[in-house]
Amino acid sequence: GMEVVTWSPNMTQERAAAKGATSVSFDELVATSHIVTAHLVLGPTTRNLFGASQFAAMRRDAIFVNTSRAGLADEVALAAALKAGRPAMAALDVFSEEPVPTTHPLVGLPNVVLTPHLGFVCEPVFRKFYGDVVEALTAWLYGKPLPRVLAA
């Protein structure tokens, strides 16, 4: 099994327990979690909530995931932290600049997975997404360059 901890300015122990989780302080969540995944709205109190000090406090084997809002994490601080080995890895599908430029500090890092954000689920989005997947797989099968791949 897995122990799930949560933090929110509005979370109570009772609400967390009803979902099978334990509510902890933000600092405890950052320092003890194996996987830290952000699910917050972006606002004045959450912008750059994850910065250099939070990344430095994470476990060496932690994985940071942000599929919520780009501004929740300081991307430059995250890139520096990943190069320093804490957290161990990151996975993101939201970025301060989209499409992500090849000069972005996270592009090319071996311990980062960057994917496009599919924030709006509808048939046209999935048709485009699956068409892109088929195009990439076809190129790979025939030894051709992959379309839309970012590399440093």
Where are these regions (language model features)?
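C-terminal helix-to-coil terminal segments
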Residues: S96-A152
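Residues at the starts of beta-strands that form the adenosine-phosphate
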Residues: M2-E3
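Rossmann-like adenosine-cofactor binding region
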Residues: P9-P105
